[in-house]
Amino acid sequence: MGSCGNGRSSEYDDPASLEKMEELVLPLKLMPLHTNGRLYDMRLSSPTATCVINSSSGSFDPIYRAWTKKYPSALNAFDHIVAYGKGKKIALFLDYDGTLSPIVDEPDNAIMSDQMREVVRNAALHLPTAIISGRSRDKVFDFVKLTELYYAGSHGMDIMGPVGEHDSVTNHRSSINSNRKQGKGVKIFQAGTEFLPMINEVFRLLIDKTKAIDGVKIENNKFCVSVHYRNVEEKNWQLVSQCTNDVLKVYPRLRLTHGRKVLEIRPVIDWNKGKAVEFLLDSLDLASCKNVLPIYIGDDCTDEDAFKVLRDDKRGFGILVSSVPKDSHALYSLIDPSEVMEFLKRLVMWKNEEASHNK
């Protein structure tokens, strides 16, 4: 993803200009995540990132500008957002890939910048903060390297938080205490541990089944298996789909979902990033609290479950990170990780100012 430029032009905020652009936008519908891995679904979930700023004129792509009428920039709408947070505790939920780090061709190279790490650390010191990713929990921690956060890997099926913060995590029947390489005790909640042997078996089968496909990468994310096809020629995407489905059809307790140039095999259980948000709010003793404003920032279709939870409950805001116009359950948008970093900086600054005024 990339904005191909810095800052938002004043033209972006001109309601009259947006009205003029409205007829250029085709109706955008949030498509369901099909479970058959067809080529159509792979293309649908993997739109090509676009340059949303014209390098010569500095103006926004007209279709993207019109799209932001429905999903306003969270930076431009910042005062409106924090107005809802006045006097409330803000709970921050963040995706990793494409949100805190750029999307890269090699998944193992999705490195978080030192500047972003410091911004996230500062946010976590002032706000309860969690990272919810499709990656394995340990892998996300290896990227982020911050002990102040909650981590939810495998789309929220594997959750870790510092011991001593909130007892409700360890009191859950699926929770355990552990001492990890982070250097301190942690609380761990895991949904669907009975699926682990099955996931490991599918991982091995997929490595063997796809070994002849150039560019494919199979990733074991503990509670799910990811089949990355970002580096596969599009003419071979159907082959990736077929190999994945050939393995999956003998595992009725597993299902297939789509991410950005990735097929993901997960347990058939009622758990997703939205459920993880609800669980974490409960663990933070914020589930029934009216004085809380949850904010979820993510870029992937798997983040839609979290956006939907906040929207349906009318209790928080989802912010979609995208340079491509697409329908979403989010209420606001940001273009790329650089705008995410700016939003987080402003959020912490605002929270500090509010705290100083209340003293």
UniProtKB/Swiss-Prot annotation:
Q: Name one GO biological process term.
A: trehalose biosynthetic process
Database matches in InterPro entries: HAD-like_sf, HAD-SF_hydro_IIB, HAD_sf, OTSB-like, Trehalose_PPase
What name does UniProt use for this protein?
A: Probable trehalose-phosphate phosphatase 10
Kindly give the PANTHER family that the UniProt entry links to this protein: TREHALOSE 6-PHOSPHATE PHOSPHATASE (PTHR43768), TREHALOSE-PHOSPHATE PHOSPHATASE 10-RELATED (PTHR43768:SF54)
Could you give a GO molecular-function term held by this entry? trehalose-phosphatase activity
The scientific name of the source species is Oryza sativa subsp. japonica (Rice)
The opening ranks of the lineage are:
Eukaryota, Viridiplantae, Streptophyta, Embryophyta, Tracheophyta
**According to its UniProt record, what is one Pfam family this protein matches?**
Trehalose_PPase
Main enzyme class: hydrolase
Q: Which reaction equations make up its catalytic activity?
A: alpha,alpha-trehalose 6-phosphate + H2O = alpha,alpha-trehalose + phosphate
- Family under the similarity heading: Belongs to the trehalose phosphatase family.
Q: What does this protein do?
A: Removes the phosphate from trehalose 6-phosphate to produce free trehalose. Trehalose accumulation in plant may improve abiotic stress tolerance.
